[in-house]
Structure formats: structure tokens, C-alpha cells
């Protein structure tokens, strides 16, 4: 079949771009079409690590999984990870090139675009189809110059575009018509149709609006996708604080602080979905409830998030929590916070060299931030649970060392999957068994590790839960719903005709 590309753009952030690309990846994969996801530029604190040690956006990793592929760095060549209100770490083809403010990155875009086009071309040469996800909205007037995330990229590679809008938020017709009107004539010409996402109710009541939209714009509505109750795929944007499963009789109550620069919040998705666990996410100025287990998550700016936690009363809470027998897990940045000292000699986090922050002091450890980031997938066994497999990935700039090597027990024994005799000790467990620290993101995803950690936290004979299996079923549910409400074969033909 002729090769083609298709770009999904949205009227707003969170319109459904990522989910539609995920659904189409699975549907093309089912048809035997070799398909790859691609997002030229992504801004997110929730990232993934490829097998060869590169960093990409979480959504592209999920889309690759839907397409039956291992995630590759070319699927997301530009990743921006905000570390201040006005700046971000810029990652090009999997490696950090530095911190930039908005003005600095705007000037850098011409270089970044070359990398994006280079990565796209490699995928286009390798796969029959490339499904491209835009970012935010293509109609942001102030961002149109040097755009490499939406229409600027579509124009560069000459591909068709679908615009998707979320009707659940209201104003869907204004969003679609307004977005189209703000595009240039050549950009409007490459829009092959609209998709309306998350519709609830009787579609016959929507038909008059759909007819008006098609007459007003000259563009077809390619599909109206229904709201999927209870649907969950890991998010890479803001943390959703609302529950993602129905209330249950929890055997374990977990509390997690949401910090200004919380990263990799998918770490606790498996916990939020587990039938015996209640997870409470605590934001600014909120009362911290009692808990059996506290998880300190990862952070893109550990020093400032550490100061935030102190300001919010978490230090006193943790001391009291541990005094009365509670458990604590620190993951990556949260692990560093549990130590004694955090040193930033190069000013990597706040542009001020030789800064030093005092940690909570629960682990005899100090961390020095280094310029080179550790990026790798990991596997092995939990050191405290016989035969419990653990998988995960590391994304961190800090190098930690224990200040007191006596009575150090490690969290896991990690290997390369080939030679287990050369296992590497990772993480920390306190002598009283109340505190765990680890650099492993995704530590709860493997069913063995999840069950063992729940047992450690106080759940007797915790129920098994396989997060990867759950995710695969959700992708299939999404794909089935999309297949029922869009003509996928006609869409493929439309894309092929556009690029002939």
C-alpha cells in the first residue's frame, strides 16, 4: 500500500489528540499496517525511557505500545520539561541540550525543527504510515511564527490534518469553526475533516449541529466518539486528582503530595487502579489526611519542591507518621528529599551555583546534581521479597551516596537480564523497615513488585493486578469504540489520495 502520514491537531490542550492517535495506531496495527506514532514537539513532565537510553514523552511510548512497537527516540524528537514558570529543560532526540526560557527556545526553534524533520523522515522511510500528534492548538496566534508543533510542521511535510475537539467541555462548534477560521488558506486546505470527542447522549440530538458545521466549513465530520466511562490511559499532562476507579473497601490508604514540579505521576497509576487501595492526592493548602503509606514522588525541581513540602507542613507530618508506625516510599526526587543533603554545584535547577538544601534526614545519604542525566530501563528482583520481579526506568541527574554504610539494606538487585551474577544493588530500606527509597520509576507496574510492596505496606495477601494487561485492554476498548464511530478504511484511502 502507498505510504502516508496523518496529523491529528486539537482545538485545545486535552482535546483528545493523544487518545485518537493511540486508537488509530491500534486499528492500523490490527489491519497489518506498519505504523509509527510521532510528535515533533512535546511539553510534559511525564516521560518514558527507550531501551537505548533516550527520553521521550509518555504518550508516544503508549502509542508505540498500541502499534506493537518498542518506543523509539525518533517518535518524539523534541521534549520540553518545564522546571520554572518561564523555562524548561530542552531535550533533543533523547538528550538534554540545556535549560532555556521561552525567548531563548523561540530563537532555537530553527535548530530544533531540523531534528524533528530528521526524525520524521527516518520513521517515514521505515513504516507504511506515520500518525502525528500536534500540541495544544494550531490557532495560537502568538505562537504561529516558527511553529514546529502543528501546522508549521504539517506544511513542511505536506500531510493531511484532522482537527479534534472535546464536546464534553462545551462550545465544540465555536472551537472547531474558530480554529479553522484562524488558519491560513493553505492550512485550511489540508484539513480533511473534524472529529468530535467524548460525546454523551443521543447522537440524533447532535445531528443538526453536525449538518450546520459541515455546511459552514465545507469539511466533513469524520466521527463522533463517545464518552468512555471509566476509561484510563496514563496521562502526561496535569495530574488528575479525581478518582480513576469506583470507591472500594480499601485495605490500604496512601497519601501523595502533588508538588509544583511533580514528575512521572504515572508511577502510581497501578495503585490508583488497584481494588484494595485508596490513593489521596494532596495539593497546596489542603489538609493532609491520615495514611498507612506516604509516597514522595519524582520532581523536576527537587530543591524548590522540597521547600514547598516544608511550607505545606509535610516535614512535621512525616515525622509524626513514622513515629506511629507509618510507611514511606520516596521515588527518584522524593528519594533524594528523604536524604540529608542535596547539593547543586552547577546551578542546574535554579541557575545559582553551589546551592545546598537540607533534606528530611530519614536516609543517611547525600545527593549531588550532575549535568549528565541517568537514562535507562531496569529490571531485577526486590531484595526483601523472594522471587518478586521488578521493572522500571531511571531518569535523574542526581548521584547519591550513603554517608553511613553501616546497616544499609538495599531495595532491589538489578541486572541486564542476561547475567544475574553481576547484579547491581539499588535503593534503600531502613533498618526498621518503614522507609524505602528508590530511583526506579514505574516500580509498581510489574504485578510481582506491586503485590510485594502492598504486602510490605500492610495488605495481607494483596490481590494481583497486572497494569500492562489492564492498559492493553483499555487500548483495545478505545480502538473498538473508534472503529464503531469512524470509517477507518475510508480515512486511510483519504490520506493516501491526499498525498498522491
From Swiss-Prot:
Keywords: Cobalamin biosynthesis, Glutamine amidotransferase. The keyword Glycoprotein does not apply. It comes from Marinomonas sp. (strain MWYL1). This is Cobyric acid synthase. Catalyzes amidations at positions B, D, E, and G on adenosylcobyrinic A,C-diamide. NH(2) groups are provided by glutamine, and one molecule of ATP is hydrogenolyzed for each amidation. It comes from the Bacteria. GO terms for biological process: cobalamin biosynthetic process. Coiled coil: none annotated. The active site is at residues 332, 441. Pfam families: CbiA, GATase_3. Residues 251-449 form the GATase cobBQ-type domain. The keyword Kinase does not apply. InterPro entries: Class_I_gatase-like (IPR029062), CobQ/CobB/MinD/ParA_Nub-bd_dom (IPR002586), CobQ_GATase1 (IPR033949), CobQ_N (IPR047045), CobQ_synth (IPR004459), GATase_3 (IPR011698), P-loop_NTPase (IPR027417). The lineage of its organism: Bacteria, Pseudomonadati, Pseudomonadota, Gammaproteobacteria, Oceanospirillales. Belongs to the CobB/CobQ family. CobQ subfamily. Pathway: Cofactor biosynthesis; adenosylcobalamin biosynthesis. The gene is cobQ. One of its GO terms (molecular function) is catalytic activity.
Amino acid at each position: 500500500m502507498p505510504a502516508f502520514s496523518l496529523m491529528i491537531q486539537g482545538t485545545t490542550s486535552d482535546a483528545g489528540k493523544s487518545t485518537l492517535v493511540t486508537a488509530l495506531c491500534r486499528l492500523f496495527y490490527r489491519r497489518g499496517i506498519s505504523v509509527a506514532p510521532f510528535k515533533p514537539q512535546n511539553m510534559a513532565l511525564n516521560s518514558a525511557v527507550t531501551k537505548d537510553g533516550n527520553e521521550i514523552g509518555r504518550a508516544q511510548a503508549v502509542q508505540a505500545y498500541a502499534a506493537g512497537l518498542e518506543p523509539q527516540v525518533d517518535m518524539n524528537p523534541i521534549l520540553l520539561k518545564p522546571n520554572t514558570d518561564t523555562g524548561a529543560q530542552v531535550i533533543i532526540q533523547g538528550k538534554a541540550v540545556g535549560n532555556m526560557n521561552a525567548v531563548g527556545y523561540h530563537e532555537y526553534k530553527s535548530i530544533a525543527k531540523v531534528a524533528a524533520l530528521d526524525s520524521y523522515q527516518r520513521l517515514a522511510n521505515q513504516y507504511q504510515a506515520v500518525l502525528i500528534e500536534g500540541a495544544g492548538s494550531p490557532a495560537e496566534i502568538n505562537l504561529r511564527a516558527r511553529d514546529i508543533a502543528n501546522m508549521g510542521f504539517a506544511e513542511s511535510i505536506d500531510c493531511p490534518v484532522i482537527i479534534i475537539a472535546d464536546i464534553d467541555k462545551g462550545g465544540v462548534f465555536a472551537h472547531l469553526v474558530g480554529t479553522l477560521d484562524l488558519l491560513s488558506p493553505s492550512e485550511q486546505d489540508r484539513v480533511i475533516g473534524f472529529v468530535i470527542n467524548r460525546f454523551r447522549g443521543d447522537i440524533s440530538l447532535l445531528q443538526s449541529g453536525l449538518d450546520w458545521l459541515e455546511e459552514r466549513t465545507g469539511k466533513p465530520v469524520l466521527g463522533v466518539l463517545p464518552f468512555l466511562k471509566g476509561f484510563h490511559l496514563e496521562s502526561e499532562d496535569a495530574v488528575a486528582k479525581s478518582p480513576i476507579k469506583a470507591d472500594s473497601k480499601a485495605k490500604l490508604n496512601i497519601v501523595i503530595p502533588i508538588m509544583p514540579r511533580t514528575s512521572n505521576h504515572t508511577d502510581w497509576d497501578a495503585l490508583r487502579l488497584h481494588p484494595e487501595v485508596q490513593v489521596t492526592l494532596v495539593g497546596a493548602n489542603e489538609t493532609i489526611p491520615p495514611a498507612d503509606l506516604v509516597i514522595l514522588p519524582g520532581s523536576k525541581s527537587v530543591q524548590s519542591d522540597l521547600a514547598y513540602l516544608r511550607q505545606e507542613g509535610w516535614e512535621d507530618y512525616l515525622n509524626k507518621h513514622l513515629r506511629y508506625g507509618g510507611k514511606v516510599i520516596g521515588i527518584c526526587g522524593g528519594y533524594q528529599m528523604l536524604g540529608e543533603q542535596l547539593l547543586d554545584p552547577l546551578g542546574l535547577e535554579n541557575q545559582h551555583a553551589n546551592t545546598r538544601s537540607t533534606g528530611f534526614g530519614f536516609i543517611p545519604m547525600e545527593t549531588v546534581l550532575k549535568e549528565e542525566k541517568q537514562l535507562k530501563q531496569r529490571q531485577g528482583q526486590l531484595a526483601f521479597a523472594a522471587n518478586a520481579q521488578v521493572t522500571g526506568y531511571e531518569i535523574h541527574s542526581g548521584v547519591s551516596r550513603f554517608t553511613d554504610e553501616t546497616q544499609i539494606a538495599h531495595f532491589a538487585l538489578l541486572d541486564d537480564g542476561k547475567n544475574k551474577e553481576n547484579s547491581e544493588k539499588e535503593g534503600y530500606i531502613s533498618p526498621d523497615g518503614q522507609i524505602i527509597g528508590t530511583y526506579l520509576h514505574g516500580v509498581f507496574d510489574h504485578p510481582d513488585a506491586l503485590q510485594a510492596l502492598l504486602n510490605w505496606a500492610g495488605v495481607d495477601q494483596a490481590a494481583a493486578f497486572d497494569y500492562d494487561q489492564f492498559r492493553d485492554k483499555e487500548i483495545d476498548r478505545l480502538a473498538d469504540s473508534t472503529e464503531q464511530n469512524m470509517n477507518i478504511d475510508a480515512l486511510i484511502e483519504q490520506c493516501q489520495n491526499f498525498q498522491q
